[in-house]
């Protein structure tokens, strides 16, 4: 096998592995969320399908595949069908630039555990997260439903507001690492994780990604008591499933990015690098589940106030302070 064919085979294997692992994790994250929320609420949760309910994700998949694929009268056909894919695909594509382990050597060849080690990896992530906004917008607008439209308008405002603070919170990590390449950012944390240098940036990023995931206490676009189910009210079957699984893939991806930027990525003592990366990422996922089970929903004005008047100015101030420290200290 020549070098080009081998490179294609290696990249294909990494892509297939990421698809399998991320989709499986997303399915079982739903199961874990239902069990954890049940424990918080003093009930049992799903425990009927398979031993300890472990086959519940498979049962949910079969249910979604066999449900009617309904399209409302007056809906824009092609945009209605396109929106779920635009919500789910950017999330999983972001995993292409995340280094989920140290490079491994196989048959004398060093293979990075990363699909694409781009020198603008951070910009790639920000670009894809911006594209996901269109899935929310199109899903609400194309449904020909006032509930879906109101949900998409709220979602657009929320995602744009917190996209800004999220991006600004990552600027200090780039200043410390001197690179936009995610593998370089991980390597720069070999001695001390960036959370030690940038606790304020980490806090801003954590709040911002919670808002990006549209989870409680930031689930304004899907407020059940007001908007039924928000921008995906009119979706059913596997198209609804794409919105649903996209949300949980986004949780995993954003947890992986938080790990990469602030918790040293795959670095850690004793355990293998991939295990460290997985443990840190899943810790963020369970933090989001815990928030859903314990916190109330914010009002819309509180949401906007937090994003524009607290997090964004604080992120800008943090950039100025970081620049001053790097220049003069």
UniProtKB/Swiss-Prot annotation:
The chain crosses the membrane at residues 12-32, 78-98, 120-140, 159-179, 191-211, 242-262, 270-290, 309-329. GO terms for cellular component: plasma membrane; respiratory chain complex I. Keywords: Cell inner membrane, Cell membrane, Membrane, NAD, Quinone, Translocase, Transmembrane, Transmembrane helix, Ubiquinone. GO terms for molecular function: oxidoreductase activity, acting on NAD(P)H, quinone or similar compound as acceptor; quinone binding. NDH-1 shuttles electrons from NADH, via FMN and iron-sulfur (Fe-S) centers, to quinones in the respiratory chain. The immediate electron acceptor for the enzyme in this species is believed to be ubiquinone. Couples the redox reaction to proton translocation (for every two electrons transferred, four hydrogen ions are translocated across the cytoplasmic membrane), and thus conserves the redox energy in a proton gradient. This subunit may bind ubiquinone. NDH-1 is composed of 14 different subunits. Subunits NuoA, H, J, K, L, M, N constitute the membrane sector of the complex. This is NADH-quinone oxidoreductase subunit H 2. It comes from Geobacter sulfurreducens (strain ATCC 51573 / DSM 12127 / PCA). The lineage of its organism: Bacteria, Pseudomonadati, Thermodesulfobacteriota, Desulfuromonadia, Geobacterales.
């Amino acid at each position: 096998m020549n070098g080009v064919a081998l490179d294609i085979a290696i990249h294909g294997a990494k892509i297939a592995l990421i698809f399998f692992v991320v989709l499986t994790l997303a399915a079982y994250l739903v199961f874990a969320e239902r069990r954890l929320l049940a424990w918080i609420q003093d009930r049992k949760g799903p425990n009927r399908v398979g031993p300890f309910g472990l086959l519940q994700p498979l049962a949910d998949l079969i249910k979604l595949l066999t449900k009617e694929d309904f399209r409302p009268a007056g809906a824009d056909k092609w945009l209605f069908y396109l929106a779920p894919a635009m919500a789910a695909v950017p999330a999983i594509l972001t995993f292409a630039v995340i280094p989920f382990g140290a490079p491994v050597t196989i048959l004398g060849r060093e293979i990075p555990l990363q699909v694409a080690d781009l020198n603008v990896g951070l910009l790639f992530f920000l670009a894809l997260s911006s594209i996901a906004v269109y899935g929310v917008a199109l899903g609400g607008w194309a449904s020909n439903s006032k509930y879906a439209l109101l949900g998409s308008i709220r979602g657009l405002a929320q995602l744009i507001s917190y996209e800004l603070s999220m991006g600004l919170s990552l600027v200090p990590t780039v200043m410390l690492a001197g690179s936009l390449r995610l593998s370089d950012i991980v390597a720069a944390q070999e001695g001390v994780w960036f959370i030690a240098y940038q606790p304020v940036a980490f806090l801003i990023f954590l709040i911002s990604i919670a808002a990006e995931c549209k989870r409680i206490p930031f689930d304004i676009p899907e407020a059940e008591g007001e908007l039924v189910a928000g921008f995906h009210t009119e979706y059913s079957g596997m198209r609804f499933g794409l919105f649903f699984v996209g949300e949980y893939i986004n949780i995993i991806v954003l947890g992986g990015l938080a790990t990469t930027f602030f918790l040293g990525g795959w670095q850690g003592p004793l355990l293998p690098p991939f295990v460290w990366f997985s443990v840190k990422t899943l810790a963020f996922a369970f933090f989001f589940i815990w928030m859903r089970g314990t916190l109330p929903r914010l009002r819309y004005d509180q949401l906007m106030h937090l994003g524009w008047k607290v997090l964004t100015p604080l992120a800008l101030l943090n950039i100025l302070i970081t620049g001053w420290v790097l220049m003069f200290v």
